[in-house]
Amino acid sequence: MEYMTDPVKHTPGHILCCDCGVPISPNPANICVACLRSKVDISQGIPKQVSISFCKQCQRYFQPPGTWVQCALESRDLLALCLKKIKAPLSKVRLVDASFVWTEPHSKRLKVKLTIQKEVMNGAILQQVFVVDYVVQPQMCGDCHRVEAKDFWKAVVQVRQKTLHKKTFYYLEQLILKYGMHQNTLRIKEIHDGLDFYYSSKQHAQKMVEFLQCTVPTRYKASQRLISQDIHSNTYNYKSTFSVEIVPICKDNVVCLSPKLAQSLGNMNQICVCIRVTSVIHLIDPNTLQVADIDGNTFWSHPFNSLCHPKQLEEFIVMECSIVQDIKRSAGAGMISKKHTLGEVWVQKTSEMNTDKQYFCRTHLGHLLNPGDLVLGFDLVNCNLNDEHVNKMKSDRVPDVVLIKKSYDRTRRQRRRNWKLKELARDRENTDTDDERQYQDFLEDLEEDEAIRKNVNIYRDSTIPVESDTDDEGAPRISLAEMLEDLHISQDATGGEGESMMT
């Protein structure tokens, strides 16, 4: 007979705590958890209350040593910012977990629950959970302080153009709106010959200068002025100024090129018409339809001026018009415009209809003009031309009249215009009485030139009924397909998430 015995079950033994005598499982310290916590506090040295700075103007928190960051409540960025405030004490323990404890948004308190571990007596690892209270203290950041002190800008971009017309500035304004280059500006100030853009950082101003160089022919100079300095920390506070000069040529200007420049452009005639100003100056020779593009560097190397200003435009009536079929081209001639037609016309001033004085000229508007049409142009015969290049030209090389564009009834065009443009919010120093007429000229240029229209956001005006693309006079109009709807977003699509802590 064999005796069956139950298998021996090995159970861990118990020992008595060396302090209180309570039976416990063996551990390296031979002390119960309660006694160990009473003797050792692993959170010692970690502050339980910390202050954190918050700017209520811009809703940003201060991150040492000198930056301000924007963080939403109970976000990971804000938690990282809070832990950095106690980074040195936390380096002595092992951080296991960290999370926010909910507080009222207006309580100016942030509570963070931390779980830490640390090796204590004889290799025993103790874990502890505690809460750090962050007191939010209001403090105005440096940027907001400068705003309140009216000394908030650090860089300014001064854009200037020495012309009597603002067509280039109106075009530049639309490009700035289209690409959102005005979003970082603190203030935009309009003066009589340009615009000033104020920025809170030099980097934003440099970005604006680069944008201007890509859109219009310019040159610029940079300077800076020392405002304050700290010799102990070796820090300096500068104000930077970027002076940007746009070429003094606008659309519909008649210019006279230097002989050297005209020869380098394909033996063009020196008298040319500016048909467009974008990133380069687009010129056309009204006698041969030869076109040329002049960039900023070429212009400043061989500068030229406008012979007449827009107020000198005179109205002519077309008496006779014929198309030139065979265009003679000299050796080395440049490109010929395919969008224009060369014509020979006889015109007479509308102010001299009681006389029989007529003028003969060649024009690039042969595809638009018919006998009886009204056209705007410059009378170079009876005009006092004070230009060094014109004075050196032979009289037979200077045309009597240079026609610029066909004339339409402006009142009717304004009444039928069913589109509009947006404008920059800016401070106006002086309002010129001629600004409205110049703005209407720019709107007419948009209707007549499709190439410029492509770079501009045009919005449909719902108050004006939609009509055909051309009116009874044949004046060009912008089609509905080229217009955008003017949208107004009145509510925040993201809802209330990430709202500011203080109001």
Swiss-Prot record:
**Localization of this protein:** Cytoplasm; Nucleus
Gene Ontology cellular component? cytoplasm; nucleus
* Modification type Phosphothreonine: residues: 433, 470
Which UniProt keywords are present, listed alphabetically? Acetylation, Cytoplasm, Nucleus, Phosphoprotein, Protein transport, Transport
Signal sequence interval, chain numbering: none
Q: Where is this motif: Nuclear and nucleolar localization signal?
A: 405-422
* Residues in coiled coil: none
Task: Identify residues that carry N-acetylmethionine.
Answer: 1
Q: Does the keyword Nucleus apply?
A: yes
**What is the role of this chain?**
Acts as an adapter for the XPO1/CRM1-mediated export of the 60S ribosomal subunit.
Similarity comment text for this entry: Belongs to the NMD3 family.
Assembly state and interactors?
Found in a 60S ribosomal subunit export complex with RAN and XPO1. Interacts with XPO1. Associates with pre-60S ribosomal particles.
By what name is this protein known? Answer: 60S ribosomal export protein NMD3
What is the scientific name of the source organism? Bos taurus
* Gene name tied to this protein: NMD3
